């Protein structure tokens, strides 16, 4: 399971918990749009906003869930991908973008390309929190610590970004190799840097991706895998201090009068 699957499903779960959430695709490959519908994959989006050919209100997509909106990456030709990434790298453009949003959203989730360049660095420079999915596979786990160095360097230069946590994904409880990678990660990093929630390898995620929906909308009665992202959303709320911002607004609900 990759970053886009995590971004979409976590955002959906957070939106269902009442947070006004915007998912922004900064990957020139258009991973968010490709994960949903062909129409969204071909729609104008961030690239057109950045190029000043479309207003922000014209490129944001309102989903059927009122609290969830999506900004696809837009039409980025292969030959223009590097220039697009370079344009976002210093964070200035994305900073202006966030300023224009003002108070319309509680959460803005950037789905970025893999690696530490271009739009990934730009998004990190303007963000408060980073979630780093780490597949429970040897190659992916070896690169996990690199993000701590990048965040540290950014903070030394004045950025406010911090690591909300590593999210272990594709975990196979019955597979010795998969468990060994996860256990090595749990052993080598401070406990507070690793999210308690883990995402298993589950066919429901592939099925949902093929259907172009979050796993929570795969069927009218959501599969058990959807509960994992509900748990993740609750954990992210607590770690990011979101619940404190609504203290006093979340009272017990009586079951009967």
Where are these regions (language model features)?
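Walker A/P-loop phosphate-binding motif and the immediately C-terminal alpha-helix
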Residues: 1-29
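Active-site signature of alpha/beta-hydrolase-fold catalytic machinery across serine-
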Residues: 9, 13, 35, 122
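Conserved catalytic-core segment of NTP-binding enzymes
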Residues: 16-17, 22, 102-103, 107-197
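Phosphate-binding loop that captures ATP/GTP phosphates
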Residues: 20-21, 29-72, 195-196
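Conserved nucleotide-binding/hydrolysis micro-motifs of P-loop NTPases
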Residues: 28-29, 76-77, 138-139, 171-175, ...
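Short, hinge-like loop/turn segments at secondary-structure boundaries
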Residues: 38-43, 150-151, 182-185, 213-215
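Cytosolic-facing regulatory segments adjacent to core modules
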Residues: 56-57, 64, 70-116
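C-terminal lobe/tail of nucleotide-utilizing enzymes
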Residues: 156-257
């Amino acid at each position: 399971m990759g970053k886009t699957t995590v971004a979409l499903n976590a955002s959906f779960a957070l939106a269902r918990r009442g947070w006004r959430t915007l998912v922004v695709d900064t990957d020139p490959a258009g991973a968010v749009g490709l994960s949903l519908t062909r129409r969204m994959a071909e729609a104008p989006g961030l690239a057109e906003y950045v190029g000043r050919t479309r207003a922000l209100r014209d490129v944001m997509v309102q989903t059927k869930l009122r609290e969830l909106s999506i900004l696809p990456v837009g039409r980025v030709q292969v030959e223009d991908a590097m220039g697009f990434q370079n344009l976002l790298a210093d964070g200035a453009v994305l900073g202006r973008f966030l300023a224009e949003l003002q108070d319309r959203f509680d959460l803005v989730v950037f789905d970025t390309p893999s690696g530490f360049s271009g739009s990934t660095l730009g998004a990190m420079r303007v963000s408060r929190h980073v979630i780093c999915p780490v597949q429970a596979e040897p190659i992916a786990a070896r690169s996990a610590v690199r993000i701590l160095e990048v965040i540290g360097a950014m903070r030394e230069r004045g950025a406010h970004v911090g690591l909300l946590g590593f999210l272990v994904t594709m975990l196979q409880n019955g597979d010795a190799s998969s468990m060994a990678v996860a256990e090595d990660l749990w052993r080598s990093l401070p406990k507070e840097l690793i999210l308690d929630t883990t995402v298993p390898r589950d066919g429901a995620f592939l099925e949902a991706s093929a259907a172009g929906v979050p796993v929570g909308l795969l069927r009218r009665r959501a599969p058990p895998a959807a509960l994992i992202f509900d748990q993740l959303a609750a954990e992210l709320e607590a770690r990011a201090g979101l619940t404190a911002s609504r203290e006093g607004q979340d009272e017990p609900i009586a079951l009967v009068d």
